[in-house]
């Protein structure tokens, strides 16, 4: 028995096949082509959209990196400005402290000088008062030279004990 035998069923199979091709071509070619074309257009549109989205994403990434770099630069500048300001304030505080110290020293020296001068004036007044008292005692007693010297020594001793 041969593998392919040519008989009347073979003939009908060929006719059925061509008839099926004709029916498929006549009734299904356009809808299938339309579906295939729509699918092809949809895939192409999605590919174009994906390419567009990829470019947008790359641009957004570049923009974000540029913004990050700008922010870092700005942050660095802010830190440097803050450091400069802190250094200036430190120098100003040191300068003010030195000026205050100098003012305090000058004020203290002036006060010491005033106290010293006041003490000298007070001492001068006391010496004048003591001299006046001594002169008064000398006049009251009308003493001779020897008594006057002993009276002065006695008065000086009394003044020394009081102090």
Curated annotation (Swiss-Prot):
Which membrane topology term applies here? Single-pass membrane protein
What compartments host this protein? Answer: Cell inner membrane
Q: Predominant location of this chain? A: membrane
Against InterPro entries, the record matches this protein to: ATP_synth_b/b'su_bac/chlpt (IPR002146), ATP_synth_F0_bsu_bac (IPR005864), ATP_synthase_B_chain (IPR050059)
Q: Which residue spans traverse the membrane?
A: 3-23
Q: Name one GO molecular function term.
A: proton-transporting ATP synthase activity, rotational mechanism
Presence of keyword Flavoprotein? no
- Family per similarity comment: Belongs to the ATPase B chain family.
- Give the record's subunit note: F-type ATPases have 2 components, F(1) - the catalytic core - and F(0) - the membrane proton channel. F(1) has five subunits: alpha(3), beta(3), gamma(1), delta(1), epsilon(1). F(0) has three main subunits: a(1), b(2) and c(10-14). The alpha and beta chains form an alternating ring which encloses part of the gamma chain. F(1) is attached to F(0) by a central stalk formed by the gamma and epsilon chains, while a peripheral stalk is formed by the delta and b chains.
Q: What is this protein called?
A: ATP synthase subunit b
The organism's lineage is: Bacteria, Fusobacteriati, Fusobacteriota, Fusobacteriia, Fusobacteriales
């Amino acid at each position: 028995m041969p593998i392919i035998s040519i008989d009347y069923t073979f003939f009908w199979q060929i006719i059925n096949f061509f008839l099926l091709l004709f029916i498929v071509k006549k009734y299904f070619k356009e809808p299938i082509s339309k579906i295939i074309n729509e699918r092809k257009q949809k895939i192409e549109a999605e590919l174009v959209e994906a390419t567009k989205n990829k470019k947008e994403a790359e641009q957004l990434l570049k923009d974000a990196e540029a913004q990050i770099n700008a922010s870092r630069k700005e942050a660095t500048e802010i830190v440097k400005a803050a450091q400069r300001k802190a250094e200036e304030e430190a120098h100003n505080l040191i300068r003010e402290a030195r000026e205050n110290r100098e003012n305090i020293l000058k004020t203290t020296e002036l006060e010491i000088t005033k106290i010293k001068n006041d003490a000298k004036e007070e001492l001068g007044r006391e010496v004048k008062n003591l001299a006046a008292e001594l002169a008064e005692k000398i006049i009251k007693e009308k003493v001779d030279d020897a008594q006057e010297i002993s009276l002065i020594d006695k008065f000086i001793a009394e003044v020394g004990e009081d102090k």
